[in-house]
């Protein structure tokens, strides 16, 4: 005796309704063999649709067993049930259940995508099926552009995409006119002639008479199961000749009758998880996974494009968040670099030595131990690039009839280099001028404007510094500082000239030491303190390391950037919540689409992937737009703020993309998980 292809044994299905359960199927026993054409007939509410859902592995029995090819479906997990639906069942629904936003070819390709069929192969198969069913010229029409009969033929073609060993047709003619209904019945007869098992669920006895076997169901129980004595007449009415139909339709479905006429074809085994699979299997799995991912990306893009305004509003929070993060980081980096440049202009990598114990020491003026010999000793140290002395007084300057007070500083020839000062006119004095106490002077722009005006060239002019004539040989360039513009008048002369001819003192007010590049500033500071203490016999001085200022500025800049970035991240989180909200709405709107995908064999992971990809795509697009806006803001910033610029780093941009992706994953996961956990029956029933 032949083993049935589909077998229900003592199947009961009940649904909760308040405090009680409603029994929809009661102790149903049914066997269907391969190659049969069966009609399940019953009135509305009789349980026929629930029976079809159990047969198609969309639902499961509350009690009893259902086997497919001898395999108990109760023992299968959700992915294995999806594999059964994908590879052995094809559904033809009364309401067609086609995706409205894609064309006929794309609707047909959907089961093959989840089966891992290569793109070229599934595309060719879809076009072939449409051609054989008379829809070659409608291949790229969307469902809304097709008649009801044409949509049902597309639905039949989709059921055949992966072979369709068992065709489950739920009221296949219910929404069609008479002519279209007859065409659908004829196609089902032709498929049965090829060996497909056909199960027609209907309330119309005129449709049921086209089956070889009629099963009547009432109040959840099978009340009759009999052969159809009028089947031959119905076949003739449909205009189907079995022999001709088999020959003509074999090419239409592309299946071997021999294969489909097996009495007990074995359903596929569970997916092999053996890590020692061969390379070819891994390649096929990778190709199948890539195809599903590409489909998820394509459908996500279609969903976003079909709701442009909603997508833009959803992305707005992400755009604002990413723009804020990238811009704030760029502003912080630009500000930090500008501040460091400003500090560099007054001498970076330098250590200043002053008399006394600290700032404000009342006895500092009485300490006269800093002398030029200390400068010479420091210059000889391996960690010192240069050392320059400094002594200063406020003296009267006179040029012709103009008298002004200015700060006159006696410095060494390396002073200007150590302080990073540039010259607008002339040059600095050299070592020879220092040694010979030459009466030359370098002035700043403020002094130039006071004595000579803004346009006159002062080089070579003689000015009186406290009645000592000095020749102007250089003018330093103006500096626009973040710490404010300097209004004081400054004159620099060789420290030997200042000590011997102007101040009458042999000691120094301070020494500026420039540390060699690559030498640790803190270690150099300790070494020079040790040296100076040895020379003086006691520590009667203190040091001020400019490196500490640099570190303070860097730390302050980092703290400020972090604070502002945290504020911007709040905006990003708000945007992420908006994405989650819209994705939840999208899942609700597309519940029927989810049900269709599950019916044709999509796994829960496929549904999860599709909606997760959609959320990530929204966030990535928002991130890309946000980064572009940040660059635009950077350009505008440069137009209005000339002193410094926003500095964009590759790290900040990569971080922005990572943040937008993580936002999509984190806030898109819950809606995607909700979508993947939908019951396919409930999903298909929703509008």
UniProtKB/Swiss-Prot annotation:
Residues 246-256 have a biased composition (Low complexity). It comes from the Bacteria. GO terms for cellular component: plasma membrane. GO terms for biological process: response to antibiotic. Residues 246-281 are annotated as: Disordered. Its EC number is 7.6.2.-. Its main location: membrane. ATP binds at residues 42-49. Signal peptide: none annotated. It is a multi-pass membrane protein. The chain crosses the membrane at residues 312-332, 560-580, 617-637, 650-670. It is an enzyme of class 7 (translocase). The keyword Translocase applies. It is found in: Cell inner membrane. Residues 6-244 form the ABC transporter domain. It holds the Pfam family MacB_PCD. InterPro entries: AAA+_ATPase, ABC3_permease_C, ABC_transporter-like_ATP-bd, ABC_transporter-like_CS, MacB-like_ATP-bd, MacB_PCD, Macrolide_Exporter_MacB, P-loop_NTPase. Keywords: Antibiotic resistance, ATP-binding, Cell inner membrane, Cell membrane, Membrane, Nucleotide-binding, Translocase, Transmembrane, Transmembrane helix, Transport. One of its GO terms (molecular function) is ATP hydrolysis activity. Homodimer. Non-canonical ABC transporter that contains transmembrane domains (TMD), which form a pore in the inner membrane, and an ATP-binding domain (NBD), which is responsible for energy generation. Confers resistance against macrolides. Belongs to the ABC transporter superfamily. Macrolide exporter (TC 3.A.1.122) family. This is Macrolide export ATP-binding/permease protein MacB. It comes from Burkholderia lata (strain ATCC 17760 / DSM 23089 / LMG 22485 / NCIMB 9086 / R18194 / 383).
